[in-house]
């Protein structure tokens, strides 16, 4: 086989020059203040990507019962929109005001507010207030992050339990903004049984999109997996579309992340990005998001 020969360069275009694109990037972990987004906004806009995934940070927003401090999230969303980027919001995580266990975990990661009526009602109020506030600015809202992993559902993943959470959260999303779209899943474990249990609760009828996280070294694995997701969703709601919500590696061998054991370099990272984004688009996902805009210093979700 002859090796490919470079014949030229693709000129980069700013996001403001692009009306729409199926390529996105992650701004995850700002709910825990783990990096300064001011250093990233302009650089990301120059990439020409469109969709930017952010996490809503309930614990950072509601520190006093019933009082929402939106300023930090306002700044992020407004800065993205000002640069012609499209934020979509992952609704997470828990809040120690209502779930005591959430106070023992950094960022309340993995502590869903589902055990008591007080927790459920507080979550409903928060979600409805958030979607109402960002109506006209944010279209897509995702229900939690990687609920099929024990790190994000600490008392033990349960597809049926998550399905009920999806239905309740979808109702809150649409109470705040009837035009909003609901993204559910954010699945990472390739367990179709879990996904079926979730959909069997009736959650599929409340969803517009299924999101998945494709941390697979070989991008060729994606085709069968995405087709399986589509086929399963079609049993419950043929209108569900698919989003690739996270995939990616760091640029160095001592980093953190799902595929941290690779001997990564910036060149290898770039090759991984190109292969995986192309594979996602080949499967006609609605859009594909790369994790993330920077190398993370730790592996918290």
Model-predicted segments: where are they?
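N-terminal substrate-binding region of glycoside hydrolase catalytic domains
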Residues: 2-129, 135, 142, 148
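Active-site-proximal loop/turn and secondary-structure-junction residues that shape catalytic pockets
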Residues: 29-31, 58, 93-95, 147-149, ...
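Aromatic/acidic polysaccharide-binding cleft in carbohydrate-active enzymes
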Residues: 248-301
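Active-site cleft segment of glycoside hydrolase catalytic domains centered on the general acid/base Glu
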Residues: 34-38, 64, 70, 74, ...
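A structural signal for short coil/turn segments at secondary-structure junctions
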Residues: 47, 84, 134, 138, ...
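Mobile, glycine- and charge-enriched loop segments
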Residues: 4-31, 226-269
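Structural preference for beta-strand elements that scaffold enzyme active sites
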Residues: 20-24, 50-53, 86-88, 139-142, ...
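Anion (oxyanion) recognition and catalysis
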Residues: 81, 174, 281
């Amino acid at each position: 086989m002859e090796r490919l020969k470079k014949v030229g360069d693709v000129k980069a275009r700013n996001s403001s020059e692009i009306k729409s694109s199926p390529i996105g990037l992650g701004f995850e972990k700002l709910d825990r203040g783990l990096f300064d987004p001011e250093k990233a906004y302009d650089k990301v806009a120059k990439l020409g990507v469109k969709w930017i995934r952010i996490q809503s940070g309930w614990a950072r927003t509601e520190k006093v019962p019933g009082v929402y401090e939106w300023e930090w999230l306002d700044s992020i969303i407004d800065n993205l929109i000002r640069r012609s980027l499209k934020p979509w919001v992952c609704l997470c995580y828990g809040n120690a005001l209502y779930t005591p266990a959430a106070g023992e975990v950094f960022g309340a990661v993995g502590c869903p507010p589902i055990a008591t009526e007080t927790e459920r009602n507080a979550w409903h109020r928060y979600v409805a207030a958030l979607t109402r506030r960002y109506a006209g600015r944010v279209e897509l809202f995702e229900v939690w992050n990687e609920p099929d992993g024990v790190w994000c559902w600490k008392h033990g993943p349960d597809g049926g339990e998550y399905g009920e959470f999806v239905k309740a959260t979808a109702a809150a999303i649409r109470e705040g903004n009837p035009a909003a779209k609901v993204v559910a899943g954010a699945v990472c474990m390739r367990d179709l049984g879990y996904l079926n249990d979730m959909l069997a609760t009736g959650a599929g009828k409340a969803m517009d999109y299924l999101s998945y996280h494709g941390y697979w070294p070989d991008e060729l694995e994606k085709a069968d997996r995405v087709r399986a997701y589509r086929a399963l969703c079609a049993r419950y709601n043929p209108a569900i579309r698919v989003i690739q919500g996270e995939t990616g590696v760091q640029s160095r061998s001592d980093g953190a992340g799902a595929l941290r054991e690779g001997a990564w370099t910036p060149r290898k990272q770039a090759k991984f990005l190109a292969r995986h984004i192309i594979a996602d688009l080949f499967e006609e996902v609605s859009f594909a998001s790369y994790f993330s805009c920077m190398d993370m210093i730790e592996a918290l979700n």
